[in-house]
Amino acid sequence: MLEIGDDTRIAKQVKFNQGEHTTLRVGDRTQIYRGGEFTGDITIGDDVFINRDCYVRPHVTIGDRVNIGPFVRLITDTHEVGPHERRAGAVRHDPIVVGAGSWIGASSTVLAGVRIGAGAIVAAGSIVTEDVPDDVLVAGVPARVVKRLKG
């Protein structure tokens, strides 16, 4: 099921892959630019801006007033380590939460199970493998706190 809020603009080229028992909720006054792909249960808040070609997997929650740069990936898929014959074992989806007012820079990747705190900034090109506290700037591969921001 697809639920779209008031005054929300979604480019025609955005792809939604929703199953029979999944819901994508997009809040009011949100913009999603072309080329994005959104799969499974996803909640996107109010006043969110998602730039072009973002890839979002199931079990993602994006808070209000979040900005997401182009080519960002929110990847909830992860695998158990399997036996020698096939190391990528059973798949699961660990949720990602993006806190209100945060900003994820271009070409960043956020991996399964991560929480990005409210008001945090993820610098462009970062790979986020661990939780990010509120009101910090993280950067790098893997992303690390480089600056505390004023609240």
Predicted regions located by residue number:
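Glycine-centered loop/turn positions within well-structured domains
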Residues: D134-V136, R144
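Short alpha-helix at the nucleotide-sugar/activated-sugar donor binding site of glycosyltransferases
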Residues: N67, A120-I121
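Conserved G/P- and acidic residue-centered "switch" motifs that form tight phosphate/ATP-binding loops
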Residues: V122, G140
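A short, acidic, flexible beta-alpha connecting loop/helix-capping segment that sits on the rim
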Residues: S126, P142-R144
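Beta-rich strand-turn-strand
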Residues: P58, A106-A120, S126-E130
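Flexible, glycine/small-residue-enriched loop-and-beta-strand segment within the central core
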Residues: L2, R9-A112, V141-P142, L149-K150
